Amino acid sequence: MNSKILAACISALALVFDPTAPARAASPEIWLGPEELPPPGPSAVDLMDMFTPDAPWKTAAAHTQVFLLQGPFLTRATQDQLNTIVTDLKRRGIAIAVAVGVMNVPHDPPSGCGGLGNVEGYGTVQQAAKIAREIKAAGGEIKYLVMDEPLYYGHYYTQAPGKGAGCHSSIEQIAKLIKPTLDVYTQTFPNIVIGEVEPTFFIDGQANWQSDVSSWADAYRETMGKPLAFLHLDVEWPLANGVQDALAVYNAAQDLQHRNLLEKIGVIYNGSRADKSDAAWIKAARDHLLLMEGQHKLRPDHVIFESWTPNPTHAMPETDPNALTSLVDAYLNRMRN
């Protein structure tokens, strides 16, 4: 047998039988999250039109496993809107994910730092109860809960112009803060799968960040009795070191997988506020996908197409190359080829 073929076979068998190797799905799970922030935040103009039987994203919908709903949208949505969303997603067989702050600190706390509405990443048990209750009342189930950047906003964040001050809480304090909020969701939806999103640029570069990421994953498992189900990477694409930071955090996440502290990794493919048109935003998102999975050979478990910026203004139709759902179709075509 050719020595190169033999070596390749041995390497493949080593991966198959390596007990520390993380499980990898045959194909990634596709998540979709149009912008849906309440005023004055941006929202896709056709967001609610997506949840009708003839909505023009049928191919994308048939291959989307998870629809991502944002906490700020859910706290202001009417019950009728939630009924419409849940009914349509159930009909399509698409699971619901909720991305929301979970560090249990109320608005304007006595400490003067953190808090719901002051700093991203925070929430309350009351907010969690409202979201869970109304999704359940609509006949729905939250399959995935995406904690909104608890490590960054709880531990590292200082303050942004016009925003509240960060608390610089210890990792142990953050773990204690998330527990009451997460308990609300797990009590309402016992099968809920809990993970998080973190901003890679603002994690990599912090002093001792690899140790902090490991300590955070340890603290989460100790607090909740199971490892983080997933980590989604929020990449600062326009920054000079944005991609390198993302790759560093991706590698750290793989280390967590090998240590059974993390189950799956996801990458958010999007544009940025620097992209001032729908066409520019979509092109950037496609370029980022090709960069990470083509050039850098990443194989994330979750592929997430998500926007929280003014573009793209439309989610549909999927035949419009400048609409968000067209990214799902483009990804499917790439996989087939």
Q: Predicted regions span which residues?
A:
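Acidic (Asp/Glu)-rich catalytic clusters
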Residues: 52-62, 80-97, 132-140, 182-189, ...
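Substrate-binding cleft of extracellular glycoside hydrolase catalytic domains
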Residues: 79, 84-191, 278-286
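Substrate-binding cleft/loops of secretory-pathway carbohydrate-active enzymes
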Residues: 202-227, 245-252, 279-294
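Boundary/entry segment of secreted carbohydrate-active catalytic domains
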Residues: 25-75, 102
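C-terminal segment of classical bacterial N-terminal signal peptides
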Residues: 15-22
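Substrate-binding cleft of secreted/luminal carbohydrate-active enzymes
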Residues: 30-37, 229-240, 263-337
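Structural preference for beta-strand elements that scaffold enzyme active sites
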Residues: 27-33, 64-68, 93-99, 142-146, ...
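Active-site groove signature of glycoside hydrolases
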Residues: 131-168, 195-203, 226-240, 301-309
